[in-house]
């Protein structure tokens, strides 16, 4: 299970001031570019990709439709993704599939897609269908993050992850049940079949997230003989 840590600089200066030494134990960096105004993203990109050269990087534009900070039309969303991909070819590109389904055809040639679904209100009743539809598209990674209302919601996400991973062993999944009651899902990836877990360095960006140091301690405990 790899540890993913988001970075969200709000300016070029903040990007340049990131202390790289704090990320030594991080497996994957997620650049949450939605912390920036749309017109600043291309200008800040060189600082991010140069600073984290040697790390795997996810480029993410988390829109307000799925709990992020930026408002983009479908055309603007795809244009920014394509521009970043053509210049920097990041290891992974997050694509909010259900929020931008109309333009997904323009992404079919991308081998590095993380097809994602985020719901900060609930764990929808059709969660199995969401797993199924994303899996059928065979992206690099299927990512699902939903908000539980009770313990059963947490168990449903974990069980569906295990079930779909068993049937599709070559598909990478990154799933999480958010909030305090869902926190166990962040640690159980080796059992459920979720290959990524998300932690934070300075401030949490999702309910239930924990720090890198806390995640490392838990992983060490779980990995011990």
UniProtKB/Swiss-Prot annotation:
The keyword Transmembrane helix does not apply. GO terms for biological process: 3,4-dihydroxybenzoate biosynthetic process; amino acid biosynthetic process; aromatic amino acid family biosynthetic process; chorismate biosynthetic process. 3-dehydroquinate binds at residues 30-32, 62, 186, 209. GO terms for molecular function: 3-dehydroquinate dehydratase activity. It comes from the Bacteria. Pathway: Metabolic intermediate biosynthesis; chorismate biosynthesis; chorismate from D-erythrose 4-phosphate and phosphoenolpyruvate: step 3/7. It catalyses: 3-dehydroquinate = 3-dehydroshikimate + H2O. Its EC number is 4.2.1.10. The active site is at 118 (proton donor/acceptor), 143 (schiff-base intermediate with substrate). CDD domains: DHQase_I (cd00502). It holds the Pfam family DHquinase_I. SUPFAM superfamilies: Aldolase (SSF51569). NCBIfam families: aroD. Involved in the third step of the chorismate pathway, which leads to the biosynthesis of aromatic amino acids. Catalyzes the cis-dehydration of 3-dehydroquinate (DHQ) and introduces the first double bond of the aromatic ring to yield 3-dehydroshikimate. Belongs to the type-I 3-dehydroquinase family. Homodimer. This is 3-dehydroquinate dehydratase. It comes from Streptococcus agalactiae serotype V (strain ATCC BAA-611 / 2603 V/R).
């Amino acid at each position: 299970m790899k540890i993913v840590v988001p970075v969200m600089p709000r300016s070029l200066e903040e990007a340049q001031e990131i202390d790289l030494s704090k990320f030594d134990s991080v497996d994957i960096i997620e650049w949450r570019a939605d912390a920036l105004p749309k017109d600043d993203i291309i200008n800040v990109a060189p600082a991010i990709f140069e600073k984290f050269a040697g790390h795997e990087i996810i480029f993410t534009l988390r829109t307000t439709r799925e709990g992020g900070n930026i408002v983009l039309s479908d055309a603007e969303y795809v244009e920014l993704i394509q521009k970043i991909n053509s210049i920097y070819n990041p290891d992974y590109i997050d694509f909010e599939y259900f929020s931008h389904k109309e333009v997904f055809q323009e992404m079919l040639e991308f081998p590095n897609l993380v097809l994602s679904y985020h719901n900060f209100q609930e764990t929808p009743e059709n969660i199995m269908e969401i797993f199924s539809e994303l899996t059928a598209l065979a992206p690099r990674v299927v990512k699902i993050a939903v908000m539980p209302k009770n313990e059963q919601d947490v168990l449903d996400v974990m069980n569906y992850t295990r079930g779909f991973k068993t049937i599709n062993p070559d598909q990478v999944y990154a799933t999480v049940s958010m909030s305090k009651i869902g926190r166990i899902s962040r640690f159980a990836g080796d059992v459920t079949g979720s290959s990524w877990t998300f932690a934070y360095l300075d401030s949490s960006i999702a309910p239930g997230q924990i720090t890198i140091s806390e995640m490392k301690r838990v992983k060490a405990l779980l990995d011990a003989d």
